[in-house]
Amino acid sequence: MKIGVPKEIKPQETRIGLTPESVKTLVGEGHEVLVENNGGFEAGFENSHYTSAGAKIIDKAEDIFNDSEIIVKVKEPLLNEVKMIRENQILFTYLHLAAAKELTQGLINSKGVCIAYETVTDQNGGLPLLAPMSAVAGRMSIQEGAHCLEKNQGGEGLLLGGAPGVEGGTVVILGGGVVGENAAIIATGMQAKVHIVDKSEKRLEELTKKFGDKIIPQLSDNIDLKKLISEADLLVGGVLIPGAEAPKLVTKDMLKLMRRGSVIVDVAIDQGGCIETSKPTTHGDPTFIVDDVVHYCVANMPGGVPRTSTFALNKVTLPYLVKLANKGYQKALGEDKNFLAGLNVHKGHVTYKAVADVFGHEYVSAGEAIKN
């Protein structure tokens, strides 16, 4: 198959869909790989690295879309990219459609075969293609949040890790999944006071076993969330409902309870955010202030560390891409129900129920869709 890797064009998105090593693997399997000129430059990959791996360098994204059977990206296509997706063409990337009505309609109109990294599952119900980027975003949430607490960033002027004889700040993490766990790794390492809120008692027990008395586990049914966020210097939103819009856990009214100069990092923003006042921002202009609270809501946080992120992403996506290219999507998805869960849009039909429900589209099961 011909596999195309266009340059990412989302603002300040500098990752790329394939590393040169991944290209080498695909070429070794007998496939042709087209990479856009300088597509990997910001992630530290030169054109020469790709040509040495067997790729062809293409000057224009349009030519890659026109000539490829599979398009491999990192972030969801922007609307001018959606227009280039052809009927029956496979798109393999993050999509986050539950928070993107116009994109969803565009992909329906394209009649392409759209497989989302973030809804592919594993045998345990985990999200193996989302996990590495969630880990990166979770760790970055504390780094970025700590920076935003500085006075010249609009924060309260607090050093999150404290100083000799001076207590550090308080971090409240909503959600104990991959984002929350990785946020806690950095926050506890900085010696902040860390609360983790989750609805699962079992998950909190796992986190307590990992972190010991470095965290304060809080079962969501048993806490006064208003009181807890009023104590937070840094609030991290890391709640996820797979493939669906994130629940709004913190309302605008609750925001008024937070300290002046405190910080919110809403990692869930690519699924709509779990804070009512959140709105997507970019690495170029990452923050805004509402009611004296700094909001950091960059929708592609791992794009700020493209080299680490691209390697981490390829480590998990490549085996699935090899299956797609070697077997074709119908066989690859048909023999693996966990991979099939990644199919969100198929030839004009929405095949992921949470997306169909949120926008009122007719739902066609992925299993039925690939038979046609």
Identify what each model region corresponds to.
Residues 209-291:
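Rossmann-like adenosine-cofactor binding region
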Residues 69, 75-76, 95-96, 221, ...:
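Short glycine-/small-residue-rich Rossmann-like dinucleotide-binding loops
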Residues 66, 70-149:
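Phosphate/diphosphate ligand-binding glycine-rich loop within oxidoreductases
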Residues 31, 86-89, 109-112, 259-262, ...:
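A short helix->loop->beta-strand "cap" motif at the edges of active sites that frequently abuts
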Residues 118-159, 168, 269, 274-372:
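Adenosine-phosphate binding glycine-rich loop
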Residues 12-13, 21, 25-32, 45, ...:
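Metallocofactor- and cofactor-centric catalytic cores in central/energy metabolism, strongly enriched
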Residues 54-67, 218-229:
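Short acidic low-complexity segments
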Residues 6-7, 11-44, 152-240, 287:
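Glycine-rich phosphate/diphosphate-binding loop of Rossmann-like nucleotide-binding domains
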